[in-house]
Design a protein with these regions (language model features):
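C-terminal beta-strand-rich structural cap/linker in extracellular carbohydrate-active enzymes
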Residues: 235-260
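Loop/helix patches that line or flank the sugar-binding groove of alpha-linked glycan CAZymes
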Residues: 26-27, 36-48, 53-222
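Residues at the C-termini of beta-strands that transition into short coil/loop
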Residues: 9, 46, 112, 226-232
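Short, small-residue-biased leader/transition segments that mark boundaries at the very start
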Residues: 1-3
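Acidic, His- and aromatic-enriched active-site or binding-groove loops in soluble protein domains
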Residues: 5-10, 107-110
Length: 260
């Protein structure tokens, strides 16, 4: 795959603003719309050597808002995604580094050592033995997101369908703090809904007739529903007749795969 560019002025800037509650989540729709035809060649990211760390005081001040942002960045299309060294550990980038100073970034101009990575390395054991419980939990979530993104063909090869247009006026869905879309591959449909809010939310997602036609799957047809984050299975269905209710934890997302 030829990567032409990173999606900095677009998805990164937009998702960052949403994570900081400075823009509505619905703005994310404009990112893929502006890249029609070249999105598969763009590199998605939330941290890199130029940008401030999510957990820094200059950004979100907390690594958890990065989880819904990472789900969107990793699963919205088939293009590559990157995590930066220590992002999965909530590295804050708040050291007072030599040339760079205390700017919320990890210096590329100085010889420097990050406490979060040292704690994961654990004096050569590489077992995360010195990580905090919060760091271990965050790393597990990132590992799930990345492994799902690379192993599920509905993500690596599936088509994308944005559901935000059908939920902008939905009184049971906050388009400022939640974002929802679908992916489809063969007999699999993936419903992805994320919550950028600090509190758990119960939403009711409208899935229009157009979605069933565009993705070519049956309205109100029984399917095996798998929660990809937990592995739990049940029999469920999607329909345009009534909204689909989902409970989303704070700063998180639900990845519900329907196999027909």
């Amino acid at each position: 795959m030829c990567i032409r560019d990173s999606d900095k002025v677009g998805l990164y800037d937009t998702v960052r603003a949403v994570m900081c509650n400075q823009a509505p989540a619905s703005n994310i729709s404009g990112c893929w719309q502006s890249l029609e035809g070249i999105q598969h060649n763009m590199l998605n990211f939330l941290e890199n050597h130029d940008e401030q760390r999510i957990a820094s005081y200059f950004f979100a001040g907390d690594p958890r808002p990065g989880i819904p942002g990472m789900i969107v960045s990793a699963m919205m299309n088939t293009n590559p995604v990157m995590i930066y060294s220590g992002q999965e550990l909530g590295e804050p980038g708040m050291d007072d580094e030599g040339f760079s100073g205390r700017d919320g970034r990890t210096t590329i101009f100085d010889y420097w050592s990050l406490a979060s990575l040292r704690n994961w390395i654990n004096e050569g054991a590489f077992d995360g033995g010195k990580l905090t419980a919060e760091q271990r939990q965050l790393r597990e979530v990132y590992a799930k997101i990345l492994n799902i993104s690379k192993s599920e063909r509905v993500i690596t090869e599936g088509v994308f369908y944005d559901l935000m247009y059908a939920n902008l006026s939905n009184p049971y869905f906050n388009s400022h703090r939640q974002f929802v879309f679908m992916r489809k591959y063969q007999n699999e449909v993936l419903l992805v809904v994320v919550n950028f809010d600090k509190a758990e939310q119960t939403v009711r997602i409208q899935i229009p007739d157009e979605a069933f036609k565009a993705l070519d799957f049956g309205d109100n047809k029984a399917a095996v529903q798998t929660d990809l984050m937990t592995g739990e299975n049940c029999i469920s269905t999607l329909t345009a007749a009534w909204p689909y209710q989902v409970v989303i934890p704070a700063y998180s997302g639900r990845l519900l795969k329907f196999t027909y």
